[in-house]
A protein has these predicted regions:
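Extended alpha-helical targeting/anchoring segments
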Residues: 2-280
Length: 280
């Protein structure tokens, strides 16, 4: 994967609450060197959670997501990221990957998963901007077990295909909110992706990014009915196990014997659990 080293280096960014970066002239300079530019506005929203921000901004949009992590001891990490919308996605099934929606010109539209991902990263690679949140534009998604042969061809997929869930999905995020739990700040980001690689339309791209930021700011400030759920009278969902209990215990015992015999030092036996839901 190639890494771009542009000649234009912007200064470290330090935003006050309510401030938007970059100004138009800096955006124009950045557009001459890179195909990914985050237009960012910092707001104070210390009473909001990632789930609350998702409800206000995403509304189940295509390619929306929540990305966060827990630290040791059960506390949340400093950053939570809410993807409100995406321009396109790389979807992989059965050894073949392709873009749906918009994709970067000059990058492979289809191929193996690794070929398509590497091609997109090469086309859109850009250095980080100091002072910005650690995620300001990325491919975000999930990788399933079915994608393992891409890295390790000797582990060919032999299990039957039992669902239509893709082996991997990575979305190209266009609107992201980064919650900084240390300062109570939310960085709203309208990410300008130059998908066609053209120098035309820079001013229009900036204007559209500002319009998107204004809309996100208004959505975040709008009241929303609280989602309060209780268990009183609710029927517990039926959990369906992929593997019968006796078969699962047999696999556990076989794993223990393999470890005792020195054939392995660690084996994790798992199975899929299915629950029906009307959520979307």
């Amino acid at each position: 994967m190639s890494v771009l080293t542009p000649s234009y280096q912007c200064e470290p960014v330090s935003l006050e609450w309510g401030q938007t970066w970059p100004p138009r002239d800096v955006f124009v300079d950045l557009a001459a060197e890179r195909r990914v530019i985050p237009v960012v506005r910092r707001v104070l929203a210390d009473e909001l959670s990632a789930v609350g921000v998702y409800r206000q901004l995403a509304h189940g949009n295509f390619g929306s997501f929540i990305l966060e992590s827990a630290e040791h001891g059960g506390s949340w990490g400093r950053w939570s990221f809410v993807g409100a919308s995406s321009a396109g996605a790389i979807v992989a099934r059965d050894g073949h990957a392709q873009w749906i929606g918009s994709h970067p010109e000059g990058a492979l539209e289809e191929g193996t998963f690794l070929e398509v991902v590497h091609s997109a990263l090469d086309a859109l690679a850009a250095p980080a901007i100091e002072g910005m949140p650690p995620l300001t534009g990325a491919l975000v998604g999930s990788l399933g077990w079915g994608i393992i042969p891409e890295w390790e061809p000797t582990l060919a997929a032999t299990a039957p295909k039992e669902s239509d869930i893709p082996d991997a999905t990575l979305v190209l995020a266009t609107e992201v909110a980064a919650l900084d739990h240390a300062t109570g700040s939310v960085y709203l980001m309208a990410i300008a992706w130059n998908l066609n690689g053209s120098a035309d339309g820079v001013d229009g791209a900036y204007d559209r990014a500002i319009e998107r930021l204004d809309a996100m700011t208004a959505q975040l400030a709008s009241p929303i009915a609280p989602a309060v759920l209780g268990s009183s009278g609710a029927t517990p969902p039926q959990v369906r196990e992929r593997t019968a209990r006796a078969d699962f215990e047999s696999s556990v015992n076989a794993a223990k014997r393999a470890i005792e015999d020195g054939d392995a030092f660690q084996i994790v036996v798992s199975q899929r659990l299915d629950v029906s839901t009307s959520a979307s």
